[in-house]
């Protein structure tokens, strides 16, 4: 599962997810992509489950890029602990995802296989997603 090798600080504020993704919202490497339609935290386990599902379905064909990284630590307190005595220990890692963010990209396989693989991965995500295809026009005319 994905997690940072080291961080400057062990714990973070929860924060809030306002607006839409302004970065990472366009296809960069592959031909097909899975795009988030809602804002949410996506855990490293969910990212890994989606990756496994897609690679198993594609069967060694094509290439997969994971476009999100879980860099936010989520802390939890032990069960049945009294209030106070500080913030809990980091328990797992999440990626903060806003609407429009590309989660996965694929290429080297047919659209039908890519669509089916992404649908399986989408079931493992806690948000609504959509399948998008890249425009193949490499050099747009400047008219």
Curated annotation (Swiss-Prot):
SUPFAM superfamilies recorded: Ribosomal protein L16p/L10e
GO MF annotation: an example: structural constituent of ribosome
Keywords, alphabetical: Chloroplast, Plastid, Ribonucleoprotein, Ribosomal protein
Domain of life where this protein originates: Eukaryota
Localization per Swiss-Prot or TrEMBL: Plastid, Chloroplast
Pfam families according to UniProt: Ribosomal_L16
Any one GO biological process: mitochondrial translation
CDD domains given in the database record: Ribosomal_L16_L10e
InterPro entries: Ribosomal_uL16, Ribosomal_uL16_bact-type, Ribosomal_uL16_CS, Ribosomal_uL16_dom, Ribosomal_uL16_sf
GO cellular component, one term: chloroplast
NCBIfam families (UniProt xref): rplP_bact
Subunit structure: Part of the 50S ribosomal subunit.
The family this protein is said to belong to: Belongs to the universal ribosomal protein uL16 family.
Protein name as annotated: Large ribosomal subunit protein uL16c
Organism: Spirogyra maxima (Green alga)
Gene designation: rpl16
């Amino acid at each position: 599962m994905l997690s940072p090798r080291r961080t400057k600080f062990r714990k973070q504020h929860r924060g809030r997810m306002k607006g839409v993704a302004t970065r990472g919202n366009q296809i960069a490497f592959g031909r097909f992509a899975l795009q988030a339609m809602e804002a949410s935290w996506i855990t490293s386990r969910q990212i890994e489950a989606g990756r496994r599902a897609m690679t198993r379905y594609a069967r060694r064909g094509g290439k997969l890029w994971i476009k999100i990284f879980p860099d936010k630590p989520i802390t939890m307190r032990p069960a049945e602990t009294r209030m106070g005595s500080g913030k809990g220990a980091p328990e797992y890692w999440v990626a903060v995802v806003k609407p429009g963010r590309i989660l996965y990209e694929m290429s080297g396989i047919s659209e039908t296989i890519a669509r089916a693989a992404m649908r399986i991965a989408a079931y493992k995500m806690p948000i609504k997603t959509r399948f998008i295809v890249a425009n193949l026009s490499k050099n747009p005319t400047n008219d």
